[in-house]
């Protein structure tokens, strides 16, 4: 029998023994040299391996630091009873022949809210909005803008259903024409011509020589006046 000693080899490799065996127990772990061996019992953790955890999520430095591609969309499951499991962001199929197939879909079980953290006059650095070339909004009830202003940067309206801009409305109602110049305002204007109307109603009786008298202040032509006996 061969005499085994430190440095003995077999097949050209050093024989492992208690002094050079690379596996060592460390509590419930097993180390290879100084490195932990993962097992079914001791599984790798997200913090140990630059993972984003399914259970714990990941934000800031623990979140994704580079672009992430999702081939079939991002599904956001409802966390309440009655919500749809189709919530999420999904890509279209690239078929430009039909809008519903080509568009990217932002899906919601009921509605989509756009929220920001602006304060004061709303001119902070947090902005929200839809900014493609065309925004088509369909609603069966109403479209509510709960903000100080709704701003349109486009030109003036061209159709009856178009939303108008303030400068367009101001220009339309403040335009001075020959007809507008011939009208009398509600107060403060003096006419230079005759005023003809079927009847004039005066709330107050005449009290100055230049006032037009009311019917109860005059004597009707050809009427009989009874002044009584003196």
From Swiss-Prot:
Example of a GO cellular component annotation carried by this entry: virus tail, fiber
Main location group: virion
Entry's localization field: Virion
Keywords annotated in UniProt: Host-virus interaction, Viral attachment to host cell, Viral tail fiber protein, Viral tail protein, Virion, Virus entry into host cell
Magnesium recorded as keyword: no
InterPro entries linked: Tail_fibre_p36
GO biological process, any: symbiont entry into host cell
Subunit structure: The distal half-fiber contains two molecules each of Gp36 and Gp37 and one molecule of Gp35.
Function: Structural component of the distal-half tail fiber.
Protein name: Tail fiber protein p36
Native source organism of the sequence: Enterobacteria phage K3
Lineage of producing organism: Viruses, Duplodnaviria, Heunggongvirae, Uroviricota, Caudoviricetes
């Amino acid at each position: 029998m061969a005499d085994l000693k430190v440095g003995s080899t077999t097949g050209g490799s050093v024989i492992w023994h208690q002094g050079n065996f690379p596996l060592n127990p460390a509590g419930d772990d097993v180390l290879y040299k100084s490195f932990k061996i993962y097992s079914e019992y001791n599984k790798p953790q997200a913090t140990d391996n630059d993972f984003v955890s399914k259970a714990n999520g990941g934000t800031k430095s623990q979140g994704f630091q580079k672009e992430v591609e999702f081939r079939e969309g991002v599904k956001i499951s409802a966390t309440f009873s009655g919500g749809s499991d189709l919530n999420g962001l999904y890509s279209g199929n690239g078929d430009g022949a039909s809008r519903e197939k080509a568009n990217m879909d932002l899906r919601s079980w009921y509605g989509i809210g756009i929220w920001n953290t602006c304060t004061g006059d709303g001119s902070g650095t947090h902005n929200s909005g839809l900014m493609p070339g065309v925004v088509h909004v369909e609603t069966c009830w109403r479209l509510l803008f709960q903000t100080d202003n709704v701003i349109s940067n486009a030109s003036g309206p061209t159709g009856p259903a178009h939303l108008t801009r303030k400068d367009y409305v101001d220009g339309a109602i403040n335009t001075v024409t020959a007809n507008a110049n011939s009208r009398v305002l509600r107060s403060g204007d003096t006419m230079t011509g005759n005023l003809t109307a079927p009847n004039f109603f005066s709330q107050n009786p005449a009290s100055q020589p230049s006032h037009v008298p009311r019917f109860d202040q005059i004597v009707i032509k050809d009427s009989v006046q009874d002044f009584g006996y003196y």
